[in-house]
Design a protein with these regions (language model features):
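Small-residue (G/A/S/T)-rich helix-start motifs and N-terminal tracts that mark the onset
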Residues: 1-73, 148-154
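Residue-identity detector for glycine
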Residues: 12-14, 29, 42-45, 66, ...
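Conserved beta-alpha-beta core of the PfkB/ribokinase-like small-molecule kinase fold
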Residues: 77, 83-154
Length: 154
C-alpha cells in the first residue's frame, strides 16, 4: 500500500482539509499519515471561525517519524498558517523526500476569486519557495507565480 504524509488543517465544518483528503486518498488505496497544521471550527470561507495554530508541533512530527524510520511515497501539503509553517514543511520535505517521493502542494489561498484575509505577501513568498521543491502545484498558485493580472490579488 502506498503511503502519503498529508500536511493540512483539520476543519470541523466544511468539506475541505484533512476531512476531505483522508477519505479520498484512502479510497484510492493510499495510507494517509496526517500532519495537522491547525484545528479550525470551520473552514476560513465562513464568516465566523476560530483557529488553533499547531506550528509548534510540526518539528515533533519530523523527530518522532524520523526515529520511527517513516518513509512516504508522497508528501502533500495544503493549508498552512504562515511563513514559519512553510519553513517547517520545507524541513519535513527535505528530511523525508526520497528519489521516488511525489511532492504535491495545494496553497489554499482563497475561494471564489477572493484571497483569504490572512494571505499576506510574506505567505506568498513562502509559497513560491515551497513550490520550487514540489512535483505538482494545484491551482490557483500558477496565477500568482506567473504575475498575471488576476482580479483578486494585487
Amino acid at each position: 500500500m502506498r503511503k502519503a504524509a498529508v500536511i493540512h488543517d483539520l476543519s470541523g465544518f466544511g468539506k475541505c482539509s484533512l476531512t476531505a483528503a483522508i477519505p479520498v486518498l484512502s479510497a484510492l488505496g493510499v495510507q494517509c499519515c496526517p500532519v495537522a497544521t491547525a484545528v479550525l471550527t470551520g473552514q476560513t470561507g465562513y464568516p465566523c471561525y476560530h483557529c488553533t495554530d499547531l506550528t509548534a508541533m510540526l518539528p515533533d512530527y519530523i523527530d518522532a517519524w524520523g526515529k520511527n524510520n517513516a518513509h512516504f511515497d508522497a508528501i502533500y501539503s495544503g493549508f498552512l498558517t504562515g511563513a514559519e509553517q512553510i519553513s517547517q514543511v520545507l524541513d519535513f520535505i527535505r528530511y523525508f523526500r526520497e528519489e521516488h517521493t511525489l511532492l504535491l502542494v495545494d496553497p489554499v489561498m482563497g475561494d471564489d476569486g477572493n484571497a483569504y484575509p490572512f494571505f499576506t505577501p510574506g505567505l506568498l513568498n513562502g509559497m513560491k519557495e515551497l513550490t520550487l521543491e514540489t512535483s505538482i502545484i494545484f491551482p490557483p498558485l500558477y496565477l500568482l507565480l506567473s504575475h498575471q493580472n488576476f482580479y483578486c490579488f494585487p
